[in-house]
C-alpha cells in the first residue's frame, strides 16, 4: 500500500513508522520544511516503546504535490483546527480518487472536510472517513524520534458514507 501521512507531529511520526514497519510505502508530508529537515536528510524515524528501532521512510517532503502524487490512502494526523485548510490544499493538488482518513476527526470533522474539499475539487471524489481518536499514545521526543507508549486495541472509524465502512476497515 502507498500511504501518505499528513503531519509530522506526535501521531504523524508514529503512524509513518508503524506503516513503514508493516511493509508499506510511506510518504510523510509536513507544511513546514524546517520541522522535517533532519528526517528529510536521513529518511529515518527513531522509535522507542511499542515499536522500536530506526525505521526508514520512503519519501519525506513539504511539497504537497509530491506527497499526493499517487497515494492509495491519505492519513491526516493533524489537529482538527487545520482540517479545513488541509481539505482545500489536498483538493487543489490531488489527482486521483482515494481514501482520506482524519485521525482523529471526532466531531463531524469528515463533514467539514468533505464540504471544503468539494468546493475546490469535484473531478476526483474522495472517500472521507474519521476516527474517534488516534490509535497511538505517543510523544515526539525530537524532530526525528517518537516514543509510542501504547497502541489502542480498537478505535472507532466511520466514513461519511457508512456503506464504505467495511471496505475501509478491510483496507486498513
Kindly label every feature range from the protein language model.
Residues 80-142:
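Rossmann-like NAD(P)(H) cofactor-binding subdomain of soluble oxidoreductases
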Residues 51-101:
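Rossmann-like NAD(P)-binding element
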Amino acid at each position: 500500500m502507498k500511504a501518505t501521512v499528513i503531519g509530522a507531529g506526535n501521531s504523524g511520526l508514529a503512524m509513518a513508522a508503524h506503516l513503514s514497519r508493516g511493509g508499506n510505502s510511506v510518504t510523510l508530508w509536513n507544511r513546514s520544511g524546517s520541522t522535517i529537515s533532519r528526517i528529510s536528510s536521513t529518511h529515518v524515524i527513531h522509535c522507542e516503546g511499542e515499536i522500536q528501532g530506526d525505521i526508514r521512510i520512503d519519501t519525506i517532503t513539504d511539497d504537497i504535490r509530491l506527497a499526493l502524487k499517487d497515494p492509495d490512502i491519505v492519513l491526516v494526523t493533524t489537529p482538527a483546527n487545520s482540517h479545513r485548510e488541509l481539505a482545500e490544499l489536498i483538493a487543489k493538488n490531488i489527482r486521483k480518487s482515494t481514501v482520506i482518513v482524519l485521525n482523529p476527526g471526532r466531531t463531524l470533522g469528515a463533514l467539514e472536510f468533505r464540504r471544503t474539499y468539494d468546493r475546490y475539487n469535484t473531478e476526483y471524489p474522495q472517500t472521507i472517513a474519521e476516527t474517534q481518536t488516534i490509535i497511538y499514545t505517543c510523544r515526539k521526543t525530537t524532530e526525528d524520534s517518537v516514543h509510542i507508549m501504547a497502541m489502542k486495541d480498537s478505535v472507532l472509524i466511520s466514513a461519511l458514507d457508512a456503506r464504505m465502512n467495511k471496505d475501509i476497515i478491510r483496507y486498513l
